[in-house]
């Protein structure tokens, strides 16, 4: 029943207006992004173009250190056969279930909110020099699963138009 409820809620994400994260408030386990990304975490996923066609495999390798309400994480991101890029995150809890973050390829500050097993945040990604799009909007939903792993769904937009969607599975790596 829990899976059916989660799948129905995920399905609502595809509908026009953004779903509020507090829809998930009564779900468990509770998502704490600082706790989740502390340690060694890897992801595997797929990047889809605007028509929903898979175009690339996405992998990340994340190493995070936390100190209470603060996380510093180095993320190696590989898309398809491209060379890996490094994103360095600084995340901070700024209130009950509220978070902010910066990263070396981010414009401004990411803002996010956790509720139950879900976390949603939005931020602006600065693309590499020479890319005509310059910046794109990132809308990320993270769902903590019963086994302690996480599902990520990211929608990348420019001027409100969906360019890319990414689905990833994140899991802790044993030492």
Language-model region placement:
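Bacterial signal peptide processing site
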Residues: 16-18
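A short, Trp-centered hydrophobic/proline-enriched beta-strand micro-motif
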Residues: 37-45, 152
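N-terminal helix-cap/turn-to-beta initiation motif at the start of protein domains
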Residues: 24-40
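Glycine-rich, aromatic-bearing surface loops/beta-hairpins
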Residues: 144-175
